[in-house]
């Protein structure tokens, strides 16, 4: 008898039930690993699978996490370039793709990443046909649409990280300006995750107090407090981080974990993810835009009907047109 057989006596004759909350992260770059670590630290899965085409880096990252498993509640961390390792995942997070370069807009990345998705998405579907598919790769709104088309999944099971991070940046900067914790500052960024995103100034509030009621010019030209600069800082934030450290990672990783938590814990929490938006607020094209929605264990279950001012609605339509201008040229 082996040491293991002498030590452990089996009670069950059949094989134990496998993972119930398996999460896969595709891509072990900076964003992928920040997402993986954030998911592990929040104890959101009982098994974590990592996939990448770069075998040495993949093996090294997996070993590094495994060596720290004593300090985590998730000890089963697996990795392989073969997608069979992802089988029966509850959530699959796709971070793989070409990295955004300094000064490069997210939309310029699109065709390079579409070609990568043509390999990734069918493999995910093959091994986890019932998963919730979460796209993080940029440009995330267009690639969420691409993932939906390539997967054949119903719309509620294909989401993106969207403007969840944009809104977090917005609330952080607002908090800095008001000397309050971001959780006390409420405001939404909708539309594209990127340059044409739309701040919903009419909904910005602290403790239910509308800031635009206190300052009717908030977010507009002629505002002596220049709140419009807050949104500019949100848009420029990623570019500034890339300029300073070469890439973004930690904030988007934490944002991804926040979305995964809403799914695996069935939080039914309001967040903002790209969803199919034709017919909403005057949007005419088949695009995915971030709007307030509800995430639970079935995916994106509900959408919140925002009350937008005419100018905000106009900006949202323009954001949709910006995405459609690129999306309609794609070869899927």
UniProtKB/Swiss-Prot annotation:
It is found in: Cytoplasm. Keywords: Cytoplasm, NAD, Oxidoreductase. One of its GO terms (cellular component) is cytoplasm. It catalyses: (S)-lactate + NAD(+) = pyruvate + NADH + H(+). NAD(+) binds at residues 29-57, 99, 138. PROSITE patterns: L_LDH. Substrate binds at residues 106, 138, 169, 248. One of its GO terms (molecular function) is L-lactate dehydrogenase activity. Gene3D superfamilies: Lactate dehydrogenase/glycoside hydrolase, family 4, C-terminal, NAD(P)-binding Rossmann-like Domain. SUPFAM superfamilies: LDH C-terminal domain-like, NAD(P)-binding Rossmann-fold domains. Transmembrane segments: none annotated. It is an enzyme of class 1 (oxidoreductase). The active site is at residue 193. CDD domains: LDH_1 (cd05293). Pathway: Fermentation; pyruvate fermentation to lactate; (S)-lactate from pyruvate: step 1/1. Its EC number is 1.1.1.27. GO terms for biological process: lactate metabolic process. Interconverts simultaneously and stereospecifically pyruvate and lactate with concomitant interconversion of NADH and NAD(+). Homotetramer. Belongs to the LDH/MDH superfamily. LDH family. This is L-lactate dehydrogenase A chain. It comes from Sphyraena argentea. The lineage of its organism: Eukaryota, Metazoa, Chordata, Craniata, Vertebrata.
């Amino acid at each position: 008898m082996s040491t293991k057989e002498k030590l452990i006596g089996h009670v069950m004759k059949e094989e134990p039930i496998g993972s119930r909350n398996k999460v896969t992260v595709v891509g072990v770059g900076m964003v992928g690993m920040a997402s993986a670590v954030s998911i592990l630290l929040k104890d959101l899965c009982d098994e974590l699978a990592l996939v990448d085409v770069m075998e040495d880096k993949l093996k090294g990252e997996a070993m590094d996490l495994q060596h720290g498993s004593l300090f985590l509640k998730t000890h089963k961390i697996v990795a392989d370039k073969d997608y069979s390792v992802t089988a029966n995942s509850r959530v699959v997070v796709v971070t793989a793709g070409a990295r955004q370069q300094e000064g490069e807009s997210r939309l310029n990345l699109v065709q390079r990443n579409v070609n990568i998705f043509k390999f990734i998405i069918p493999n995910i579907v093959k091994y986890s046909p019932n998963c919730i598919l979460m796209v993080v790769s940029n440009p995330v709104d267009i690639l969420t649409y691409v993932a939906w088309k390539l997967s054949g999944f119903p719309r509620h099971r294909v989401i993106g990280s969207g403007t969840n991070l944009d809104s977090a940046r917005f609330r952080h900067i607002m908090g800095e300006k008001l000397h309050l914790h971001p959780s006390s500052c409420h405001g939404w960024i909708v539309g594209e995750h990127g340059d044409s995103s739309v701040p919903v100034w009419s909904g910005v509030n602290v403790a239910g107090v509308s800031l635009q009621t206190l300052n009717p010019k908030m977010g507009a030209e002629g505002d002596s407090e220049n709140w419009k600069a807050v949104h500019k800082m949100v848009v420029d934030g990623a570019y500034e981080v890339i300029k300073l450290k070469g890439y973004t990672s930690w904030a988007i990783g934490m944002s991804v974990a926040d979305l995964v938590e809403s799914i695996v814990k069935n939080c039914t929490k309001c967040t903002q993810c790209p969803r199919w938006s034709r017919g909403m607020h005057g949007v005419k094209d088949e695009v995915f835009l971030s709007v307030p929605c509800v995430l639970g264990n079935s995916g994106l279950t509900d959408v919140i009907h925002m009350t937008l001012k005419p100018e905000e609605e106009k900006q949202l339509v323009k954001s949709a047109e910006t995405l459609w201008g690129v999306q309609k040229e794609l070869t899927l």
